[in-house]
Amino acid sequence: MNIDLVLREAIQNAFQSVFELSIPLADVNLQPTRKEFEGTHTLIVFPFTTTCKVSPEVIANKIGDWMQTNTQAIASYNVVKGFLNLSIKDTIWLASFNQMYQNKHFGYLPSNRQKIVVEYSSPNTNKPLHLGHLRNNFLGHAVSEILQAAGYEVYKVNLVNDRGIHICKSMVAYQHWGRGETPESRGLKGDQLVGKYYVKFDQVYKEQVAALTQTLGDAEQAAKQAPLLQEAQVMLKQWEAGNEEVLALWRKMNGWVYDGFDITYQKLGITFDKVYYESQTYLLGKEVVAEGLAKGTFYKKQDGSVWIDLTQEGLDEKLLLRADGTSVYITQDLGTADLRYQDFKPNKLVYVVGNEQDYHFEVLAKIMARLGRPYATDLYHLSYGMVDLPTGKMKSREGTVVDADMLIDEMIETAEEHTRELGKIDGFSKEEAKDLYHILAMGALKYFLLRVDAKKRLLFDPQASIDFQGDTGPFIQYTHARIAAVLRKVQQADIAFNDIVEQENFVLHPLEREVIVELAAFPKKLQESALAYAPAILAQHVLEIAKAYNRMYAELSILHEQDTKVQLFRIQLSVLVAQVIKTVMHLLGIVVPERM
């Protein structure tokens, strides 16, 4: 039963009957009632004052009175400053609960036959994944799962940036200082070894620039003329020309990085339907540049570089191809956008990329529109803010960037400390305890990064993220484990709970009603989350469900309830809460334990 729809249709009928006013359902604005007022649904009546020619209070009272008299849904109503707050009868809530309980796929929406491609992760093969990548991966994975649950056909793709000047920098550094070492000989993950040489390049390059600046007296020229950078630029040209020696080194070092990435992705529970490699797609971008030149959409400067003038759109002139013919960052996006459209024919292409690239994706959409691409208006940049760490709370190998692997390991240690202190591993084997620490660590990390609006910059506090009493992943995970423990005791006591709860003469406790209200909102919250590409909506909602259940659990007995009808209902309510928690946490990429 869709209570929102029932109420909106009743309100539509009320306006027709009381004011002879025909209003579309879309104009019936129902919102959750604020906690300080009685009721669960609030009608905003201000938009109707002009048409009805009476005050909001009069409208609200007349509509409320009509609904209480003419429908079976309304137990009572109250009016606060022109807002109509509605309280629903317990029989309606119970009917809604029974439908939810019997639906093993409750909350999932039917197919809408819309295709969406979600691109996320997009790492560079010159360093390990870091804290910023974690927010990216968690957002991309969660958005994909949420869209799929909301009825979309979703394809998760990863574009690996495996070529370009930044890759050549680590290669040049390895040629100078690698001395043939391998991940095995150093006991390092491959991505960490390659990242070490990227850092080495940067250190030596800065030293060269400083020395040249003193000689030339011009820091800008020094930055361009530093020998190490010029070596990297030569190597990039050699790579694009197909130099076999350069390609062999590139394949070897990238192979190390991929092995390292695979380990990290496995820890994170991140998967993709298709992986693209820039080395295989960047030439497509050059083809698009050639097309744009032929059409007159792009233009070539005297030095041979290719540009587009977007000043009429309020932007600027954008470089598309360097004078030496090498690609820039946007070149490959031109080609891969076409390729994705050919591969999937999506209705929407979502890019999960940090907000430092906001301008880049605005430019990309304008270029595709100028080229007449049919999908130009269907490109969506899911922009997100940076993630910071409290000063001094997390070690860093380079002093500025935190490795994902290092953060995961420290989170697992923190989870172990908290879990042992609280005595939540009694009866666990060593392996079971180890699995639990990993589940809690990842739950803490993922939930903390997903619960906040993606656009906001985020301060990640490892200790706060794993607080079992806070607004955290482990609090929700513990709620699920608590329900699972109750249901095991129900099974041990051989209590039958499959019969449907009769609606007549059944009075809900306010705490039970709170739980049902939160559960009933799940399908709507899922849809809102999907439409806004906002996992934070669902993350907050599952927290409210867990809180409502814990309030009920603290006050009302389940196993020792004497009224068998009430006990039956509370057991079933517990089953549904566990089901919805497990479903939502799965959509967020989080595992919930059965025991703690």
Swiss-Prot record:
Keywords: Aminoacyl-tRNA synthetase, ATP-binding, Cytoplasm, Ligase, Nucleotide-binding, Protein biosynthesis. It is found in: Cytoplasm. Its main location: cytoplasm. One of its GO terms (biological process) is arginyl-tRNA aminoacylation. PROSITE patterns: AA_TRNA_LIGASE_I (PS00178). GO terms for cellular component: cytoplasm. One of its GO terms (molecular function) is ATP binding. Belongs to the class-I aminoacyl-tRNA synthetase family. Monomer. This is Arginine--tRNA ligase. It comes from Amoebophilus asiaticus (strain 5a2). The gene is argS.
